[in-house]
Amino acid sequence: MDSNEKLIKIIKKYRDAFQKKIEERKLEMECDNNEHYVIYNALGITDTEGYQIDLQQNVGRFLYKYAGSLLEELTISCFQSAFSDAKAKVKLANTIDKSPQNIEIDCLVENKAYEIKWKDATTDGDHVKKEHKRVQIIKDAGYIPVRLMFFEPNREQAIRIQSSLKKII
């Protein structure tokens, strides 16, 4: 199987899993208790609109998860095609504190530890602290951390956070 065929196979795998997850959630939602629609109604949202909002909120969560996982696997596959020594999902022990016990490098190529993000709009302070710790663990292990982000965030606060994360690498 050539590289293009391999990438297409990965895409199909994620597409099928994503579509299956949506269908499963639709079935689950048929049994949902929709008492919370009373609040939607109070805010001018009909039951039909409420269902669509709840469904799209679920689809959106799945979309972000599967989009990130898809792009990560495609990227790792490309690295492994280009670099015979590329290793995926390398775990390092947390040498700073007890939580988490390990951190994971998405793809390790020689001494470069790639973290692959399709889009990262996280804006909380806890995220920044975890990222500082992760980068320090990687550096302490003798690797160079590289953050590979395919799409930059759009919101001002997220842009500021991402800018601060770029400075620690």
Q: What are these model-predicted stretches?
A:
Residues 79, 105-118:
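Conserved catalytic cores of phosphodiester-cleaving nucleases, focusing on short active-site segments
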Residues 118-168:
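Catalytic cores of nucleic-acid endonucleases
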Residues 1-83:
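Interdomain/boundary linker segments immediately adjacent to catalytic/signaling cores
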Residues 66, 70, 74, 102, ...:
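Short, well-structured alpha-helical interface segments that form or flank functional binding sites
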Residues 80-86, 140-142:
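Secondary-structure boundary elements
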Residues 88-108:
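Active-site metal-binding core of divalent-cation-utilizing nuclease and nuclease-like domains
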Residues 1-3, 112, 147:
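Contiguous, function-dense segments enriched for cysteine-driven chemistry
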Residues 84, 112, 136:
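Residue-level marker of positions within ordered structural domains that often coincide
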